[in-house]
Amino acid sequence: QRQMCIRDSPMAGSEKTGYENSSSSIIKGARYIITPTKETKPEKIEFMKQFASDVGMNPIVMDYHVHDKSVAAISHVPHLLSTALVHVVSDNDDEEKHMQLLAAGCFRDMSRVAASSPEMWEQICLTNSSAISNILEQYIEMLETIKDNIDKKTPGYVASLFEMSREYRNSLESRHPEH
């Protein structure tokens, strides 16, 4: 008899690790993604949905391809970008550590998840490597386009990029009113 397995992903977390940093409030209202296979029995899916609801999470059932691409874009690659940001700043900081001294809101916001568990994130990245690689390729292309336009001092390019990003980011508030 074949065993059934349902992949799940609680969309909640922190850069802090260990039991001493655990908190039940972190999952309250968070999305809980359930990715069944074609063989998964409906009652197993319902069990997982009920479990998620019982612990205060919002269950969402989706195809695993959609899940893998989505979490690569909204979680896995941002963790890698945060890590890359910290590496670039660290490599460019001077002996007096002026960059470290001046690091404030933007840098702190964007670098927070770089303090996450290296072991856990290595496993996550290796497990979802194909989707992550596809999203990273898009970032590389976008960064090259941004660099080209900044080098050329293209009028309006940077403003339009920020405007589009601001609109999408602000639209998240309607999807996540609790944050």
Question: Can you name each region flagged by the protein language model?
Answer:
Residues 10-27, 33:
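Glycine-/Pro-rich loop/turn segments that contact NAD(P) or position catalytic residues
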Residues 1-6:
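Short, small-residue-biased leader/transition segments that mark boundaries at the very start
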Residues 85-92, 147-154, 173-176:
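Long, hydrophobic, amphipathic alpha-helical segments used as structural scaffolds
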Residues 167-179:
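Long, positively charged, glycine-interspersed low-complexity recognition regions
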Residues 96-165:
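Interdomain hinge/lid region at the active-site interface
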Residues 10-12, 39, 66, 117:
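Residue-level detector of flexible, active-site-proximal loop/helix-junction positions
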Residues 24-111:
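Internal alpha-helical scaffold of NAD(P)-dependent oxidoreductase catalytic cores
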Residues 7-10, 61-63:
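Beta-strand->loop->alpha-helix junctions that form or flank phosphate-binding loops
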